[in-house]
Amino acid sequence: MVLLPLKKDLVPFLEPYLPDEERDADKEKPYVILTYAQSLDSRIAKIKGTRTFISHEETKTMTHYLRYKFDAIMLGCGTVMIDDPGLNCKWWPEDEKPEHLAGISPRPIILDPNCKWKFADSKMKKLYEAGDGKAPIIVVKELPSEPEEGVDYLVMRTNFTGKMDWSDMLVQLKSKFNVKSVMVEGGGIVINDLLQRPNLVDALIITLGATFLGSEGVEVSPLVEIKLKDVSWWTGDLDTVLCSRLVTH
């Protein structure tokens, strides 16, 4: 995939919402942004279980610029099993062309409580073996009986409802794997869950594609009202980008 040049005005626009090692050094958890593309009717996919392209070329370049800026990129296993993404980075500064993309790529973190996804069969592994991507950290309820080679596992704690303890998982990522910043890309369940945890999300970067996907699409809509602050908008040729922070209670 050949990327379009990064729009120059995106760099200062995004800067206030990106990680800063000095500012974030004393924090127990990594710096976390929630970033995804949605349609005008708040859908992230046209039909459940299918891959849908919403953003356009200029904001695809922005996505890879963000990947260049973060230590790790997080997705739920459902999205990974549908899309089979590489999750590497294909953007770099003009004067810093890397020999291999692994050196500039974020580390994938896959939320896979029940060990459904297989690294061995994935595009991620092909990129890893070619030196163009990193091997993942897989977040599980318990270690699999046959751990996959090259993979690191993080055994998550659950809260009183049996759901993943987000706070503990993020703290473990920083303390055990030195992950200082994470961009969370999806899917729908993960996005909706984190939107309701403003104390864990440091910034929100949403790409709005110029399309409606219809009522059968996968909707992003938290159960409760969520208010935003520090809101900024960027408008491109076909997409608009919203950057903000979540109001904490």
Swiss-Prot record:
**Keyword set includes Heme:** no
- Provide the top EC class: oxidoreductase
Recorded metabolic or biological pathway in which this protein acts: Cofactor biosynthesis; riboflavin biosynthesis
Protein name, entry field: 2,5-diamino-6-ribosylamino-4(3H)-pyrimidinone 5'-phosphate reductase
The cross-references to InterPro entries, in alphabetical order and at most eight, read: DHFR-like_dom_sf (IPR024072), RibD_C (IPR011549), RibDG_C (IPR002734), Riboflavin_Biosynth_HTPR (IPR050765)
- Summary of the function given for this chain in its UniProt record: Catalyzes an early step in riboflavin biosynthesis, the NADPH-dependent reduction of the ribose side chain of 2,5-diamino-6-ribosylamino-4(3H)-pyrimidinone 5'-phosphate, yielding 2,5-diamino-6-ribitylamino-4(3H)-pyrimidinone 5'-phosphate.
The scientific name of the source species is: Kluyveromyces marxianus (Yeast)
Q: What is its EC number?
A: 1.1.1.302
Q: Which NCBIfam families does UniProt cross-reference here?
A: ribD_Cterm (TIGR00227)
SUPFAM superfamilies assigned? Dihydrofolate reductase-like
Tell me the keywords, alphabetical order. Answer: NADP, Oxidoreductase, Riboflavin biosynthesis
Which residues hold NADP(+)? Answer: T79, D83, M164, G187, G188, I189, V190, I191
What Pfam families does UniProt report for this protein, alphabetically?
A: RibD_C (PF01872)
Please list the reactions this protein catalyses.
Answer: 2,5-diamino-6-(1-D-ribitylamino)pyrimidin-4(3H)-one 5'-phosphate + NADP(+) = 2,5-diamino-6-(1-D-ribosylamino)pyrimidin-4(3H)-one 5'-phosphate + NADPH + H(+); 2,5-diamino-6-(1-D-ribitylamino)pyrimidin-4(3H)-one 5'-phosphate + NAD(+) = 2,5-diamino-6-(1-D-ribosylamino)pyrimidin-4(3H)-one 5'-phosphate + NADH + H(+)
Q: Which domain of life is it from?
A: Eukaryota
- GO process annotations (BP): riboflavin biosynthetic process
Q: Which family does it belong to?
A: Belongs to the HTP reductase family.
This protein's assembly is summarised as: Homodimer.
